[in-house]
């Protein structure tokens, strides 16, 4: 779920915290990517296109196709991805998971009704709602990444929290996910739409943590309380308090405790046994692996291993897989060259520098012409002795 309404709130009140760029803008950057979010995107994208990629046994392979080609695209653009996989969800998330299970049951019933009615649009809609990333999907994705020479991290708990820890430790530049709670976990940079398909033509949207705090006129603790008021995965929110009212309350009272002391109980009902304090602690001190002990290495791909893994039962085209492996190798060599070139930087030619050089050349030419004219003119004007 992430944080309800946070993206729009930032766009409205702290637009300076958002920048849209092309993927190539992040050339040379290391980025921690929410793997489960990616796999989900790949699974629903194929369903929406009406295709069903599968093995000879009927097992889906769209997540592998998406991971393979999307990762190659990132590397082609000079981005070094590290994928972070979810671990066990925190106990406080059980309520949200229960709601998702209920929604899944409702979607199954709606899908059956749509199928019986021959409603193609309804079938597609509810099919998408039933998509979920399984442990088997994650296991296969990890095996694929290993063969591609791309690192991954198993988070002990939430992937977004682990991504944020890698960013804060300086291991990577940003977190790439569609869930805004990466900011709540303290990721200084958040990239949305980075792993979207090229066909969607969506610019990458970069959120700056420091600039959003400045724009909203709050500190990091107050930002966490704001996110809890907006609605997060770990506890209920106060009904009737939307984004605008939430930021007004935080700006006025600075924390949830003081807000509760001053809240009009006739207008707003606080959830019974509201676990906002535990939710706050989960954002402040999430369960993550020590980022400093994580060694991220991008190595050469195993071409034959990729062919064996993706072709055969999974029915990938061998020629395309080998071409993909060659692109992986080429991108690694290019990144190595970039590191070498960084030791011998050439100053770019700027308009001012170019104009100055032109003026200097013109002045030198004019001076030479004047000198020549003076010399030749003097010769003609002198009388012979």
UniProtKB/Swiss-Prot annotation:
Region Interaction with PCNA: start-end pairs: 336-344
Keyword Nucleus: yes
SMART domains: HhH2, XPGI, XPGN
Enzyme class: hydrolase
Residue span of region Disordered: 346-385
Family according to the record: Belongs to the XPG/RAD2 endonuclease family. FEN1 subfamily.
The protein's name in its UniProt record: Flap endonuclease 1
Gene designation per UniProt: Fen1
């Amino acid at each position: 779920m992430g944080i309800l309404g946070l993206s729009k709130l930032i766009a409205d009140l702290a637009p300076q915290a958002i920048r849209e760029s092309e993927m190539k803008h992040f050339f040379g950057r290391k980025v921690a990517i929410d793997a489960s979010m990616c796999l989900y995107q790949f699974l629903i994208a194929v369903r929406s296109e009406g295709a069903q990629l599968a093995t000879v046994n009927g097992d889906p392979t769209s997540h592998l196709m998406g991971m393979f080609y999307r990762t190659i695209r990132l590397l082609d653009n000079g981005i070094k991805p590290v994928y972070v996989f979810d671990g066990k969800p925190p106990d406080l998330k059980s309520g949200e998971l229960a709601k998702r299970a209920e929604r899944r049951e409702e979607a199954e019933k709606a899908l059956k009704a749509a199928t019986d009615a021959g409603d193609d649009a309804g079938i597609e809609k509810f099919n998408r709602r039933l998509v979920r990333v399984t442990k088997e999907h994650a296991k296969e994705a990890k095996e694929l990444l290993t063969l591609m020479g791309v690192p991954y991290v198993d988070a002990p708990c939430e992937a977004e929290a682990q991504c944020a820890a890698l960013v804060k430790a300086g291991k990577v530049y940003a977190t790439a996910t569609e869930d805004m709670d990466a900011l709540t976990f303290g990721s200084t940079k958040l990239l949305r739409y980075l792993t979207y398909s090229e066909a969607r033509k969506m610019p990458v949207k970069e959120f700056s943590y420091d600039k959003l705090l400045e724009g909203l006129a709050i500190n990091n603790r107050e930002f966490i309380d704001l996110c809890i008021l907006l609605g997060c995965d770990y506890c209920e929110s106060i009904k009737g308090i939307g984004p605008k009212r939430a930021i007004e309350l935080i700006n006025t009272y600075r924390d949830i405790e003081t807000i509760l002391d001053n809240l009009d109980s006739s207008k707003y009902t606080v959830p019974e046994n509201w676990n906002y304090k535990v939710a706050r602690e989960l954002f402040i001190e999430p369960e993550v692996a020590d980022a400093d002990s994580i060694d991220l290495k991008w190595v050469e791909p195993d071409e034959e291993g990729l062919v064996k893994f993706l072709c055969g039962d999974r029915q990938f085209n061998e020629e395309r897989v080998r071409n993909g492996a060659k692109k992986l190798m080429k991108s690694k060599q290019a990144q190595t060259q970039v590191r070498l070139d960084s030791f011998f930087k050439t100053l770019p030619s700027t308009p001012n520098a170019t104009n100055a050089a032109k003026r200097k050349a013109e002045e030198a030419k004019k001076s030479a012409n004047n000198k020549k004219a003076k010399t030749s003119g003097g010769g003609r004007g002198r009388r012979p002795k």
